[in-house]
Structures are given as structure tokens and as C-alpha cells.
Amino acid sequence: FQYDSQYDGF
């Protein structure tokens, strides 16, 4: 699973 850009920092 890849975090979307809204979860920047993960």
C-alpha cells in the first residue's frame, strides 16, 4: 500500500 500525497512524511 502506498500513501497518497496527502500523507506526506510517511
UniProtKB/Swiss-Prot annotation:
On the 2D-gel the determined pI of this unknown protein is: 8.3, its MW is: 30 kDa. This is Unknown protein from spot P5 of 2D-PAGE of heart tissue. The lineage of its organism: Eukaryota, Metazoa, Chordata, Craniata, Vertebrata.
